[in-house]
Amino acid sequence: MQKSQNVTAVTETNGVAAALGGHHTSPDTNAGKTKDAKEFGCSLGDLRGLMEARGAEAIVRLSTEHEGVEGLCKKLKTDSLVGLNGEQADLDRRRHVYGANTIPPAKSKGFVRLVLDACKDPTLVILVLSGFINLALSFYEPTSAAEDATQHLVNATTAAILANGTFMSTTEAPSEGHGTAWIEGVAILLCVIVVVLVTAVNDYSKERQFRSLQEKIETGQKFSVIRNGEAIDVPVSDLVVGDIARVKYGDLLPADGFLIQSNDLKIDESSLTGESDHIKKSIESDPVLLSGTYAMEGSGKMLITAVGVNSQTGIIMTLLGAGKAGIGDDDSTSTSSSSSSSSSSSGSSSNGSSDSSKSGDDDLTAKSVLQAKLSKLALQIIYCGTTIAIIALIVLVTRFCLDHYVFEKNEFSLVDIQMFVKFFIIAVTILVISIPEGLPLAIALALTYSVRKMMHDNNLVRHLDACETMGNATSICSDKTGTLTTNRMTVVQSYINGNHYTSQEAQPHGANLPGSTGPILMEAISVNCAYNSMIVEPTKAGEQIQQLGNKTECGLLGFVNRLGGDYAAIRKKFPEHDLTKVYTFNSSRKCMMTVVPYAENGQNIGYRVYCKGASEIVLGRCTYLIGSDGKPHQLTGDRLKEITSTIIHEMANSGLRTICVAYKTIIKKGTRDVEKTEIEFAEDSDIDWDDEDAMYQNFTGIAICGIQDPVRPEVPVAISKCKKAGITVRMVTGDNIMTARAIAMSCKILEPGEDFLALEGKEFNERIRDENGKVSQAKLDEIWPRLRVLARAQPADKYTLVKGIIDSKATPQREIVAVTGDGTNDGPALKKADVGFAMGIAGTDVAKEASDIILTDDNFTSIVKAVMWGRNVYDSISKFLQFQLTVNVVAVITAFVGAVTVSDSPLKAVHMLWINLIMDTLASLALATEQPTDELLERKPYGRKKSLISRTMVKNILCHALYQLIIIFVIFFYGDTIFGIKTGLYAPLFAPPSQHFTLVFNAFVMMTVFNEINARKVHGERNVFKGLASNRVFCVIWVTTFIAQIIIVQFGGAWFSTAPLTLQQWIVCLVLGFSTLIWGQIVATIPSKKLPKAWKVGKGEVQPANLHINGDYNVRARSRAVTLRRSGKSLWVRGMFIIGNHLRVLRAFGMEKSEKAAFGRTAPAMTAEAAERWRASYRKYRHQKHQEKKATAETAESVKSADWAKEQKEKKKTFKQIKQVARGKSLDKDSKKHHKKRKDQTNVDMEDIELN
């Protein structure tokens, strides 16, 4: 009961008491709510108390206090069949009394808080300390002229070399005097303020963008409710107490409530309780449904009784917010803080062992390929900058000591301390220049810009790093239905009464079918389809029929209408709440069955079971088949083979999905004579509806339907683009192999003459598993490179394939895999994939929660667009790197050489401010906003191991840096002679700006600005102007930069340390700037392939767990490992879509604990006693369930032999030990011996345990 201990610990803290008790409602408000509650007959407190009960206690309280669910419906003024009337006044009144279905979000960081966060940067702290020391020492006046001259020289050196791109003095330079030495220290502090403000503004803007994205995700969540007798989808936030909600397979329950109707409904409550088994819900045994849990099987209806902060999700969020714990840490402080926000929670609910915690951290620190390589590159740059800074410091200190103490034989004085501080500032400044501080901004801009644009291309990105990871994808495992096809199902062929109707126009009319075939077929389809599947006839000419719900079932319902029937009228005869039993479709059974009462002459005489599903599977369960005379005939093995080969295979080869419809009748003994196809029973208690195997046999086949799902016309072109881009597309589908192969041929996944594999799931498993049934990576490596189609695939097969491709080292470049999924069971595969795509239309909440990107149109072409945007992000960051590193190299070398040669720098501090502004902010905006082009799909993926900076980029960086350095040093050392102007070398500290140094500055900026155009191409392209006109942002920034440079040079004066230049000098600078374009063409002629392979940076596969770059763009540390069974290990909120999103936002925005404490304070108080009652009731319920299982086991043991019982006990113990190992728990000595003994006897696949 680790989870209970955690809740107790949180509840008992002072923080919880303060937060939960800090909310007080005014007497007037309470009085108003009490008055409204009397109108409904049930107060908020009554419902909250009722929801604390579990199992039998909940049933008893519901029955005694409210006369059952129907009585509670009456008190809440709702109807279990019709629902609420939907009037806005009624909905508002319910929200006023019982609350809205929203959880108050955490207050976003204010600008002042962001400023304080920016001040925590270690580099800025060092500079602030240096500034204060410098400022304090500046007021000391040296006593000797020699010391005064020395101090002036040092001041000149440091003022010139201060190269943090943000150092600027706002005071006009004085002409002389030691009394102004304080300006340098003040300038340092002022420029730190500028840095902090720029950082805070950037973070504030970025936070607003992330909030906008988060709202987009959350507002897209809808749920089906019944209002005014009609089923409608409403936003989750619009749900109110009293709503009748329809629960279906894959739904995330958005509120608490009681079950009204259950069709084999099973719920995954592991996110709340840690219980790994799916809980079967029924009105008789366990009717309580809790928010934050998932419907894993079946369907049903529920009465909503608690929403928002009063639901289980809201209560937990209130506790988490008040407890100041478990949500996450500020990910701007360290790598571990950004990655352990989730793992710390899971660790607290596990054994607490270090091994387990470490494993969780390792999973959560996984970054994308690009982020990992950028982190490694940043470290390499910092190492180089640190080395240069240390060398500069050693040279300056050594030279000063030799000159001052050895040669001049001076004594040590306070001035010397000031000089050493100056030298230290110079070294720190060189280090600051080398740090790629603009890199996180460029990444954030590229990602957020791309994410906004991708929304227009039907890609809703949930995790920002997924969009650039997609650019590296080498393999796509795609579903068929709805992704490659239109998902508009139509029955175009059928096999009825021994006749094969081969076209849609040739389909028969129901009245013309012999015997009772027509009515039985239409009833079998209408009743045995989910009642939320329906077709809406067009209201205007030219419109198509609208299909709602499951598209396969909609195709069958359309077939009923074409037969002359009315599926809606048939359903009225069999209301959903009167259905005896529903066995919903699942991937293992491959069929759906519905049991309805069967009557003759107005008298119920038994039951009829309708079945539909995969044709070869359902037909194999049939013992009879309706023939041409309308009567059932024995279905022999030979007849079954004939139908399979001539009908099913022929339809499948035409790309049709084949569905078999069957039925059987169960007649009560004594009502009438039983026919040969019917089954007799004595009493209702004799029928075990839970025995699916008994139900799933002895059917009579009615018809086989061939359903056409046309391939999307744009898909073949998109797949051809993927092939050209070096991306392998694989189709994973549940259809049979022939249908799958035919669709693959239509999509050009398979083409004539290619030696690729198309396998069924069964054969796939036989080929990849060893003699013990375990997946062999070696065998899998022999299969997956040639595999293109996987048919009749189970979700576990998809997971095995994805995991095998990702883990494989069979190819030189490790594969990066994208996966599409829509079902609940696709969750593990979506999580395991590098990028998971969920279907926005057909996808379940489970699939969407597990995904990285949601396809809002379920279209494969949107995936191709995601690839383009991903590669565009990669290219945008590469362009910025190429540009920034060139400027970095030139600036660092210039500052270093100036410091160690003439104790002066050609670039002043204010010049470096402007250059860094160009290099960081403006270049980020200009280069990170390029539009993607189809040319991006003409290159192969980068892969996991390819260098971040290619030989071409290294060539460009070094060649352009060398060219610029030569020009700068020529002007620096010989410019006065060349231009006939006064030299700026060895000028006094407070001398007015010189044309000499202004020429150096202007030439450098002109070359930098023109080189920004060169930086637009990173793959050796000749035409650097291609696409320039379409990038308005780049053009505006470039022109603005150019004009600003003219103003700074001509009118900046002492403020910008510039002197106006003549027209001739401007022409020279412009020529030098333009010459970089010509030089770029010369550099492009150097073949990159002939350069040394060592000219690569960031090559090899990166292990990013311990790498970090400022955390700005690491929005969420995503776990890529498959989720193990979560019994006792997972925090309650794991698996909750809404809560999970909110926690990710908290981590993305770097919320501090104090802010998290405020989260949830607006929620109504939940007392510690109430929380303890909740836990106690659940413990009591689980104990009751344990006793029931124990009693069942004892009964079984009394019937079975002692050997069988012993075998079962050993198996259970083995499974328990394996789960302990999976959770990181240790075994005692006896358990270890038993585990080793049973290891070879029991074939247990760990992957199956993870999935099942």
Swiss-Prot record:
Binding site for Ca(2+) 1: V432, I435, E437, N916, D920
Compositionally biased spans, kind Low complexity: 333-357
Database matches in InterPro entries: ATPase_P-typ_cation-transptr_C (IPR006068), ATPase_P-typ_cation-transptr_N (IPR004014), ATPase_P-typ_cyto_dom_N (IPR023299), ATPase_P-typ_P_site (IPR018303), ATPase_P-typ_TM_dom_sf (IPR023298), ATPase_P-typ_transduc_dom_A_sf (IPR008250), HAD-like_sf (IPR036412), HAD_sf (IPR023214)
SUPFAM superfamilies, alphabetized: Calcium ATPase, transduction domain A (SSF81653), Calcium ATPase, transmembrane domain M (SSF81665), HAD-like (SSF56784), Metal cation-transporting ATPase, ATP-binding domain N (SSF81660)
Segments of this protein annotated with the region Calmodulin-binding subdomain A: 1124-1142
Annotated segments matching region Disordered: 330-361, 1181-1252
Chain positions recorded as ATP binding sites: T481, E553, K612, T733, G734, D735, R792, K798, N825
Compartment(s): Cell membrane
Topological domains, Extracellular: 143-180, 398-422, 901-908, 982-989, 1057-1065
Binding sites annotated in the UniProt record for Ca(2+) 2: N888, D920
Active-site feature positions: D479 (4-aspartylphosphate intermediate)
Entry similarity comment: Belongs to the cation transport ATPase (P-type) (TC 3.A.3) family. Type IIB subfamily.
Binding partners and assembly: Interacts with calmodulin.
Protein name in UniProt: Plasma membrane calcium-transporting ATPase mca-1
Organism: Caenorhabditis elegans
Gene for this chain: mca-1
